[in-house]
A protein has these predicted regions:
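Acidic (Asp/Glu-rich) sequence patches and key acidic residues
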Residues: 1-105, 111-112
Length: 112
C-alpha cells in the first residue's frame, strides 16, 4: 500500500460530440452491466469501460435475442427513432471505441 499522495500536473479532457444515446444513460448502463465490468458514478452520467470489453459488448449486442435487447431498454421507435436496432447500437459502440483516445485503453462516456 502506498501512502504518498501524487497530484496530476497534466489532466486534459476533451469530449467529442455524439448525437446518439442522448438521455439513454440507463439503457447504456444496463447494456454494459449485462456482459462486462465497468465503472459508473452514482447517477450513471459518467461511465468508463475498457476498449476491448466495449468491442466485446458490441459483438454481444448483435448476438442477443430481440427480447433481451428490448429488456435492456431498446425497442422499435425508442424516443421516436427507429434507428436503434441491434446492428445500429453495436456499430455505434464500435465507433466510440475507435474514436476514443488512442493513448488510453479506457473509453469514457459522459452525459451533460
Amino acid at each position: 500500500m502506498s501512502y504518498t499522495l501524487h497530484v496530476a500536473t497534466t489532466y486534459k479532457v476533451e469530449y467529442g460530440g455524439a448525437l446518439e444515446f442522448n438521455h439513454m444513460q440507463e439503457q447504456i448502463y444496463r447494456l454494459l452491466s449485462h456482459k462486462t465490468t465497468f465503472w459508473a458514478n452514482e447517477s450513471h452520467d459518467t461511465m468508463e469501460i475498457d476498449r476491448v470489453e466495449l468491442l466485446e459488448v458490441a459483438d454481444h449486442v448483435e448476438e442477443m435475442s430481440d427480447k433481451m435487447f428490448e429488456r435492456i431498454g431498446f425497442k422499435e421507435g425508442f424516443h421516436g427513432d427507429d434507428r436503434y436496432t441491434q446492428e445500429f447500437v453495436a456499430n455505434l459502440l464500435r465507433k466510440y471505441a475507435d474514436d476514443a483516445d488512442p493513448d488510453d485503453n479506457i473509453v469514457h462516456f459522459c452525459w451533460y
